[in-house]
Amino acid sequence: MDLFKLFSGKPSSKEVAKDRLKLILIHDRSSIAPELLEVMKSDILKVISKYVIIDDDEVEVRLTKTEEVDASSPALIASIPIKKMKQR
């Protein structure tokens, strides 16, 4: 057992590959093209940037699915680290 990996908090390459495969499957099933997702991400960041200073390098926007009782539907998840609020 590698104790460094246990406490580093970084996902293994196996976990990264698994997550990427899940994203590919979700994109395929939701019929939202990756290009459209990038355009949506860009538009969202433009609007948010009017009000706050964000960390562009750490922004993560992904498509996932919701777990509903009768069916699952696509959901857009955004993690946008805010550095500070802009003065208005």
Curated annotation (Swiss-Prot):
It comes from the Bacteria. Pfam families: MinE (PF03776). The keyword DNA repair does not apply. The keyword Phosphoprotein does not apply. InterPro entries: MinE, MinE_sf. Keywords: Cell cycle, Cell division. Prevents the cell division inhibition by proteins MinC and MinD at internal division sites while permitting inhibition at polar sites. This ensures cell division at the proper site by restricting the formation of a division septum at the midpoint of the long axis of the cell. HAMAP family: MinE. This is Cell division topological specificity factor. It comes from Clostridium novyi (strain NT).
